[in-house]
Amino acid sequence: FVSVTYGAGGSTQERTHTTVARLVAETSLTPAAHLTCVGATRDEVDEVARRYWAAGVRHIVALRGDPPAGASEYVPHPGGYAQAEDLVRGLKRIGDFEISVGAYPETHPAALSADADLDFLKRKIDAGATRAITQYFFEGETFLRFIDRCHAKGINVPIVPGILPVSNFQQ
């Protein structure tokens, strides 16, 4: 699959929709459209998901999302999905999406502990996610230990290692 971010880097959400719709219509690639909880009501997020479904998009990467520019911490939008697990449940009500969620081999920076972070991942899986995609990491052993910890928690969905491609060899 090809992961397509949601309004990242200053692009619009409409541009993201156009991109994934074109991937479905014009290529043999399977797009995984990112969808976040940030800055929108449930109805607005649900409408985006319905448009993805109507365009033939069947794979969503459901993320809480980062705080908006200028904000130091995440605050749920009034009337919006509070967390990724809520978004996963909402998406499952709309369609039988394949849903990927974020995972953190080195623990999410806002997590109270590594164990609490795994509990949160388990809730996202139990809500209906079919796969986890990790943040990037630098040591392969970190990923292998993470997989072992996931299995010990009863998390048995595929876990895809996130990679950060080198885009500037001089850096």
Residue ranges, per PLM feature:
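Glycine-rich, proline-tolerant flexible connector loops at the mouths of alpha/beta enzymes
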Residues: F1-T18, G65-G79, T130-F146
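Hydrophobic faces of well-ordered beta-strands that scaffold small-molecule active sites
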Residues: V2-V4, P31-L35, I60-A62, I99-A103, ...
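Alpha-helix-loop-beta-strand connector modules within alpha/beta enzyme cores
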Residues: G10-A33, G79-V101, L144-I163
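Short, acidic/polar
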Residues: T16, R42-R50, L112-R123
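Active-site mouth loops of central-metabolism enzymes
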Residues: P31-D43, E98-A116
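Glycine-rich anion/phosphate-binding loops
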Residues: C37-A54, P78-A82
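Non-catalytic positions within long, well-ordered alpha-helices that form the structural scaffold/packing
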Residues: W53, I125-D126, H151
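Catalytic-face loop-and-helix region of soluble metabolic enzyme cores
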Residues: G162-Q171
